[in-house]
């Protein structure tokens, strides 16, 4: 395994083929206590890891095929592995990363939110959504669908978390108000997707058996603030088995509040994922309040980086805009947004309007239907492609901006924070 990513424990020189030492098992744990997992590594790295464990390197391919291709972690189902070492080998390469704590469903079972407890006691949430056949191709969180819409049962999208909490501090977002606990490992991200893919494949949600077709990095956390783990996870999600889960890169969306250097770096990765920029205001005065990182990278810098991403990848950029009543829904802001999207992104720009989802204690609400309709009309009249997001999961606090695990972690409640003050908006919104 490469330097910096090798298992930390040194193996005994006299390790036999089927006997794994305590050092090898200890080496499967990172310094922060998060277990190393097969999904953290490329297939070549997995081969070297297995060889260091004293097993033939092709065992890595076999276990990878089970995890990514057959969507199983159960050693009893891996009958091509020797019975004498099967459980121990699987236990080292596929340690449990997520434990379900609570599951809530709505939309007649077509939307499911799961609260996960991680190995160190941190919590994250993910949301699985099934859309009927011929549903609007942009409704699922702005993600693009495969040509067949996912399956004959309709597209299935997973909203995945990349961090426990979030450090961006956006005042209208429950996760942003919770604060950052830690980054997730690549495998912790991939595990959310693998569980969802298995759930859909086995028909364990409404609509019967199907295929997970889309993944959006729009759950808890700022994906590009956890850059290396997110990019590694995207590769595991999109590479074909036994390397990964085989979901099309074009069906993966990575969102960001606008970390300009990370956007520019993402453009060099050779990935064809959709970039979604959480803009929420066309002017720096208001965006400084709604998205505090704007003080570091203002609107034009963010859109400039998004334009370069679109130019390099030839992929459409989705501009995310949460409509907040009497805050950012004024007609002149619609006109300003349209002008900026046309200037920077042209035909590769798309605006995804999001009716603000309620969060506990927040004084803000969604725009009125009339204001929303006028905002849409002005964007469309200016020649900008625009859609209004389907607000799936509101009933279970699983919609955009609502994810924040309300649980105790290391002595503090993760969601219970004071409602944001409106004072800072008094001048900016006018």
From Swiss-Prot:
GO BP annotations listed: rRNA base methylation; tRNA methylation
Cofactor note: Binds 1 [4Fe-4S] cluster. The cluster is coordinated with 3 cysteines and an exchangeable S-adenosyl-L-methionine.
Domain Radical SAM core span(s) in chain numbering: 152-395
InterPro entries for the chain: Aldolase_TIM (IPR013785), Methyltransferase_A (IPR040072), RNA_MTrfase_RlmN (IPR027492), rRNA_lsu_MTrfase_RlmN/Cfr (IPR004383), rSAM (IPR007197)
Record's keyword terms, sorted: 4Fe-4S, Cytoplasm, Disulfide bond, Iron, Iron-sulfur, Metal-binding, Methyltransferase, rRNA processing, S-adenosyl-L-methionine, Transferase, tRNA processing
Cofactor: [4Fe-4S] cluster
Binding residue positions for [4Fe-4S] cluster: 166, 170, 173
Gene3D superfamilies reported for this sequence: 1.10.150.530, Aldolase class I
Location(s), subcellular: Cytoplasm
Catalytic activity line of the entry: adenosine(2503) in 23S rRNA + 2 reduced [2Fe-2S]-[ferredoxin] + 2 S-adenosyl-L-methionine = 2-methyladenosine(2503) in 23S rRNA + 5'-deoxyadenosine + L-methionine + 2 oxidized [2Fe-2S]-[ferredoxin] + S-adenosyl-L-homocysteine; adenosine(37) in tRNA + 2 reduced [2Fe-2S]-[ferredoxin] + 2 S-adenosyl-L-methionine = 2-methyladenosine(37) in tRNA + 5'-deoxyadenosine + L-methionine + 2 oxidized [2Fe-2S]-[ferredoxin] + S-adenosyl-L-homocysteine
CDD domains: Radical_SAM
Residues annotated for S-adenosyl-L-methionine binding in this entry: 221-222, 255, 278-280, 357
Catalytic-site annotation from UniProt: 125, 400
A single MF term (Gene Ontology): 4 iron, 4 sulfur cluster binding
Pfam families: Radical_SAM
Disulfide bonds: 159-400
Recorded GO CC terms: cytoplasm
Family according to the record: Belongs to the radical SAM superfamily. RlmN family.
Function: Specifically methylates position 2 of adenine 2503 in 23S rRNA and position 2 of adenine 37 in tRNAs.
NCBIfam families: rRNA_mod_RlmN
Note: Reaction proceeds by a ping-pong mechanism involving intermediate methylation of a conserved cysteine residue.
Protein name in UniProt: Probable dual-specificity RNA methyltransferase RlmN
Species in which this protein is naturally found: Acidothermus cellulolyticus (strain ATCC 43068 / DSM 8971 / 11B)
Species lineage: Bacteria, Bacillati, Actinomycetota, Actinomycetes, Acidothermales
Gene label: rlmN
């Amino acid at each position: 395994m490469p330097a910096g990513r090798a298992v930390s424990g040194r193996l005994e020189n006299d390790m036999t083929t089927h006997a794994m030492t305590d050092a090898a098992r200890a080496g499967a744990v990172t310094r922060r206590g998060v277990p190393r997992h097969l999904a953290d590594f490329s297939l070549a790295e997995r081969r070297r890891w297995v060889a260091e464990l004293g097993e033939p390197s092709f065992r890595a391919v076999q276990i990878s095929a089970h995890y990514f291709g057959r969507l199983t972690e159960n050693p009893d189902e891996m009958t091509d592995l020797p019975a004498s070492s099967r459980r121990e080998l699987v236990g080292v390469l596929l340690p449990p990363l997520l434990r379900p704590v609570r599951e809530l469903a709505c939309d007649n079972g077509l939307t499911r939110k799961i609260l996960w407890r991680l190995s160190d006691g941190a919590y994250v949430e993910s949301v699985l959504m099934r859309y009927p056949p011929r549903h609007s191709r942009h409704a699922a969180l702005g993600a693009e669908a495969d040509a067949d819409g996912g399956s004959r049962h309709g597209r299935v999208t997973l909203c995945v978390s990349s961090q426990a909490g979030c450090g961006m501090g956006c005042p209208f977002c429950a996760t942003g108000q919770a604060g950052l606990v830690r980054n997730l490992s690549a495998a912790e991200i991939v595990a959310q997707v693998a569980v969802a893919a298995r759930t859909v494949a086995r028909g364990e949600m409404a609509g019967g058996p199907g295929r997970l077709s889309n993944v959006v990095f729009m759950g808890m956390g700022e994906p590009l603030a956890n850059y290396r783990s997110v990019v590694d996870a995207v590769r595991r999600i999109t590479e074909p088995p036994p390397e990964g889960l085989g979901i099309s890169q074009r069906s993966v969306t990575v969102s960001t509040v606008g970390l300009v250097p990370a956007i520019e770096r993402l453009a060099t990765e050779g990935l064809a994922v959709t970039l979604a920029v959480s803009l929420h205001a066309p002017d720096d005065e208001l965006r400084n309040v709604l998205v505090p990182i704007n003080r570091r990278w203002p609107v034009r810098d963010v859109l400039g980086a998004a334009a370069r991403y679109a130019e390099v990848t030839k992929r459409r950029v989705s501009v995310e805009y949460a409509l907040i009543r009497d805050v950012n829904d004024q007609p002149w802001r619609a006109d300003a947004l349209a002008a900026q999207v046309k200037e920077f992104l042209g035909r590769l720009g798309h605006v995804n309007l999001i009716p603000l989802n309620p969060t506990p204690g927040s004084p803000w609400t969604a725009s009125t239907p009339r204001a929303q309709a006028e905002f849409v009309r002005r964007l469309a009249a200016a020649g900008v492609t625009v859609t209004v997001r389907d607000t799936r999961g509101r009933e279970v606090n699983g919609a955009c901006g609502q994810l924040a695990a309300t649980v105790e972690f290391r002595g503090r409640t993760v969601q219970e924070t004071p409602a944001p003050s409106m004072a800072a908006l008094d001048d900016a919104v006018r």
